[in-house]
Structures are given as C-alpha cells and as structure tokens.
Amino acid sequence: MIKAVIFDIDGTLIDSVEGHAQAWDEALREHGFTPGLDAVRRQIGKGADQLLPRFLSPGEVEQFGAAIEERALALFKTRHLDCVRAFPRVRDLFEQLQSDGVRRVLASSGKPADVDQAQVIANIEGLVDAMVTSDDVTRSKPSPDIVQVALGKLAPISAGECVFVGDTPWDAQAARRAGVTALGIGNPIFSDAELLEAGCRRVFGSIADLRHNYDQLLGLA
C-alpha cells in the first residue's frame, strides 16, 4: 500500500491550464514573441526557467525573461483566476487519503502564494501535509528537484512508497527521475500515449476516475 501521494496542481486538481496558457501567450506577444497559443499550451506545467527557453534564445531570456514572467503572472491573476475551478471529487479524494493515513503533498512550479490560492480553490485547506513550490528549487519540472524536495518532506517514507499524480509529461519525467511511480491524468492537451511514453504507469481519465478506482491507487506504488 502506498504511504504518500504527491500531486501536481494546475490541470490536475484545478482547471487552470488554459488561463495560464493564454496569459503566457499574451505576455510573450506583448514582448514581440509569437510562438502561438497551441505551442504555449504544451509547455504549461513547467516553470519559467524551463518554459521560456523553448521560445527565446538565451540572450532573449536574459533580457526579457523576468518581465515576461511577471506580466504572465499578472495577466493570469487579473483576467483568468476568477474563472478557475476545482475538478470534481478533489476534496473527496484528499479526505479519503487522510482517513487512510496516506500523506498528501502538493508539488508545483508556482509561487507559495499561488499554491495557497490553489488550495482554497480546490477546497483542500487543512488536508495537505506539505507543499513544494518554486521557492524550494532552482529547476522546475521536468527536472526531478521538486519531487526530491517533496520526498525530503515525507521522510522516512521512501520514493518506492509514493506515487506522483500529474497531467503532463513533465510531471511523469520528474517523478520517474526521482524514483517515484507516475500516474497521469487525462487531458485535452496531451494524449494518454504521450503520458505513458513519458513514464506514467497508468493514465486515469480524471481525478474523479482516480477516486472511483481508489483501491487500485493504493496498490500502485
């Protein structure tokens, strides 16, 4: 039986990916970069350290990166945050995990204030044992740093006793590099095949599907 679940947030617990994608796309366009919204969507889930180099040269990242990131965060908060909702059965899943003594950690490329806000949106305040944010690491997913810090907070629970739940290949790659079983959440941006190829042991259709198959979740580590 697993002893801990590490959760991604955006696109996994809350329906925020499209808002982030539109905010990043607009911020990039304001600074003269036009990768296209579809291309940006497929980079959401990475931190700015990993996202920006997909579209900018190293020199452009140095010159414009901080301003683009700041603008994207501001656009998300002013234009999209109010529309973000939790996916069905998120709180139900967290309550069941808590009842069974399974620890729950949030691992996000976002800032601490953003993760706090996400807990409010997902209605899981008081149901989270620990969180890892961009302030805790120098490299975001798909680097394993975030997962490794989460494991440190879970000690003495081992990597083999945990699973990581996320919606992107970056989540799966980060988890596998840290020795943690990766589980995917199906979504319109990445196919199940892409998630499996990235390292997910299994892909569930949604958090509600994961909750429905809860007994299988417990035996997946």
Where is each model-derived feature located?
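N-terminal helical cap/lid subdomain that shapes the substrate entry/recognition surface
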Residues: 2-91, 96-102, 113
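Asp-based, Mg2+/Mn2+-dependent phosphohydrolase catalytic module
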Residues: 1-3, 95-98, 111-221
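Conserved G/P- and acidic residue-centered "switch" motifs that form tight phosphate/ATP-binding loops
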Residues: 8, 12, 108, 167
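Short, charged helix-to-loop "capping" segments that act as catalytic/coupling loops
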Residues: 57-66, 104, 148-161
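Residue-level marker of regulatory loop/turn positions in helix-turn-helix DNA-binding domains and
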Residues: 86, 107, 139
